[in-house]
A protein has these predicted regions:
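Hydrophobic core of alpha-helical transmembrane segments in multi-pass integral membrane proteins
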Residues: 34, 181-186, 205-213
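Charge-rich cytosolic interhelical loops and cytosolic tails of multi-pass membrane proteins
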Residues: 93-160
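Enrichment for repetitive, rod-forming helical segments
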Residues: 31, 172, 181, 229-232
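N-terminal first transmembrane alpha-helix
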Residues: 1-119, 190-205, 216-223
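Loop-to-transmembrane boundary segments
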Residues: 13-26, 135-188
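Alpha-helical oligomerization segments
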Residues: 203-249
């Protein structure tokens, strides 16, 4: 019986690991790999790789040894990517992308009404006031959504996991916006320094497209996270539910 009780807890941890990969490792890997491509003319990475292949061919490096070298390189790449995503991109993108853009284009009740497809939010505001003692306003909409998140986790952990995906998608989008912007500016400077270069020109176009696409994704994901929390709260508060049972066998 104890084993069956612990099984859902173990399985519930798997999505969060996947969300960490989405929100932190992928943007960090993009920044790391993009930096290598942007500085390809400066860093002797291409020559080092060619020399490695030559040494491996001359010394008849075994398949097992080559696999170890490649696996270790990928592990180091993943560690550095996670470090960049967790300690560099995540806090900076929260400050420079989410908060600054939130000042320029704040989320409002009118926008939530359109997003949820309802013309009247009075019932939602009433239900929110019943649960938390006050009504959400335009100024407090983002902060108030966290109370909806806590309520959803309490009532339905399954929907709470879905919220985790929303958070991961938003973090990935805003981190990619920052990484794309840094890479675009750095590559543009390198392009002016070296002069016309077909590779850097093509890479600039790709970075520009990535920057625009990631920003559009960020704009949608931030709405989905905040407005989606209120939508889930409305759905749960408008239907009977049972408190999650604890300690049952």
């Amino acid at each position: 019986m104890a084993e069956s009780e612990n099984e859902p807890k173990v399985l519930a941890n798997i999505p969060f690991l996947f969300y960490d990969v989405i929100g932190r490792t992928f943007p960090g890997g993009f920044l790391l790999l993009g930096s290598v491509l942007s500085l390809w003319h400066v860093l002797p990475i291409g020559d080092a790789f060619v020399r490695f292949l030559a040494v491996a061919r001359v010394s008849e490096l075994s398949t097992g040894a080559a696999t170890v070298v490649i696996g270790t390189s990928l592990l180091i790449f993943a560690i550095i990517s996670t470090f960049l995503g967790f300690f560099v991109l995540s806090p900076l993108s929260n400050l420079l992308v989410e908060k600054l853009w939130g000042l320029c284009a704040p989320l409002r009740l009118e926008g939530m009404s359109k997003f949820l497809g309802t013309e009247n939010l009075q019932f939602l505001q009433t239900q929110f006031k019943i649960q938390f003692g006050f009504e959400p306003s335009d100024e407090s909409l983002n902060r108030s959504s966290f109370l909806c998140a806590y309520f959803i986790w309490k009532v339905n952990p399954g929907l709470g996991v879905m919220q985790g995906r929303y958070d991961a998608d938003l973090l990935a989008a805003q981190s990619t916006v920052l990484a794309s912007l840094v890479l675009f500016v750095g590559t543009l400077i390198e392009r002016f320094r070296l002069g016309p270069d077909p590779f850097l020109t093509l890479w600039l176009v790709a970075l520009g497209a990535t920057l625009v696409g990631s920003f559009l994704a960020f704009e949608y994901q931030r709405k989905k996270r905040v407005y989606g929390r209120f939508g889930m709260f409305l759905a749960l508060s408008n239907s009977p539910h049972e408190e999650p049972a604890h300690g049952k066998t």
